[in-house]
Amino acid sequence: EDMLQNGTVISETMIEKPHSFFTACNVTTQIVAQVASNQYGGQSFTLSHLAPFVDVSRQKLRKSVIEERIESGEVLDDAIIDKITERRLRTEVQSGIQTIQYQLITLMTCNGQAPFVTVFMYLDEVPEGRTRDDLAMIIEEVMKQRMQGVKNEKGVWITPAFPKLIYVLDEDNITEDSKYWYLTELAAKCTAKRMVPDYISAKIMKELKNGDVYPCMGCRSFLTVEDSQRNADGSHKFY
């Protein structure tokens, strides 16, 4: 999150804060590749760190749509502008997630392996409202693309080994009348076809981990909570 929000340096090159969701996805894969080439074992990142960049792209696309309609003499109807913007945004989210999936399985680290990566999908990591809805859009696209799979050298659709997926079950997606139930249904279909994602119960994990919910390291251990490591808002630091 810090590297995406505040920029970072990769191979002596300054990487500034991304100005679109697609760029954020590209930067994420570069960070994963660099980390994987300098350590053993797996690594995890959460889609909630990408969620804020959906609205960055939304505002950028909306501005572009307005400019196009002014140039072509079209009426500036907010409903039409919003509809076009959301359609283009969906396309960008689709492209961004596809970039993550294909770059991670085709990248080779310095030891000749694809990065061992786990993607964490937990809606309650972001505030309720538009950001959570944007995160839901990202999660939905990840599930759909994983259900489709990737083509092998013979052109046959197969299940990629990485990234591994973890989906968290909580009050807003666990019952049929909950807002994000459709994601849980999609996750179940994805599991039936591709054997991912794995599932974490937020309720049980909070009981076992002092109220925290977080991913395992790659596909292995869960960190023991270190009380001295805190985020700016006082919550425990896991990323």
Model-identified regions with their sequence ranges:
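Conserved catalytic cores of very large enzyme subunits
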Residues: 1-239
